[in-house]
UniProtKB/Swiss-Prot annotation:
Pfam annotation, one family: Toxin_7
Residues bearing the modification Asparagine amide: N71
Domain topic, free-text comment: The presence of a 'disulfide through disulfide knot' structurally defines this protein as a knottin.
Summary of the tissues where the protein is detected: Expressed by the venom gland.
Database matches in InterPro entries: Beta/delta-agatoxin_fam
Lineage: Eukaryota, Metazoa, Ecdysozoa, Arthropoda, Chelicerata
Name of the protein: U3-agatoxin-Ao1e
Positions of the pro-segment in this chain: 21-34
GO terms for cellular component: extracellular region; host cell presynaptic membrane
Keyword annotations from UniProtKB, A to Z: Amidation, Disulfide bond, Ion channel impairing toxin, Knottin, Neurotoxin, Presynaptic neurotoxin, Secreted, Signal, Toxin, Voltage-gated sodium channel impairing toxin
Main function: Insecticidal neurotoxin that induces an irreversible spastic paralysis when injected into insects. Modifies presynaptic voltage-gated sodium channels (Nav), causing them to open at the normal resting potential of the nerve. This leads to spontaneous release of neurotransmitter and repetitive action potentials in motor neurons.
Length: 73
């Protein structure tokens, strides 16, 4: 009886780990598919929206962070 209960608990733990990994991978794919913002648009590196390629987020006038051209930075 103990063996059966142990196997059931082990199976549940394995299932939970597999489910958590697949959920995390799905969230990462979703984050990559989100749109980006361009020059002088409001951004937040830590939470999004993120700047498009060629721009970076600067917070000179916090809390209004904006995307600026990186000019080869």
């Amino acid at each position: 009886m103990r063996t059966i209960i142990s196997l059931l608990l082990l199976s549940a733990m394995v299932f939970a780990v597999i489910e958590a990994i697949s959920l995390e991978e799905g969230l990462q794919l979703f984050e990559g598919e989100r749109g980006c913002v361009g020059e002088n648009q409001q951004c937040a590196d830590w939470a999004g929206p993120h700047c498009c390629s060629g721009y970076y987020c600067t917070c000179r006038y916090f809390p209004k962070c904006i995307c600026v051209n990186d000019n080869g930075k």
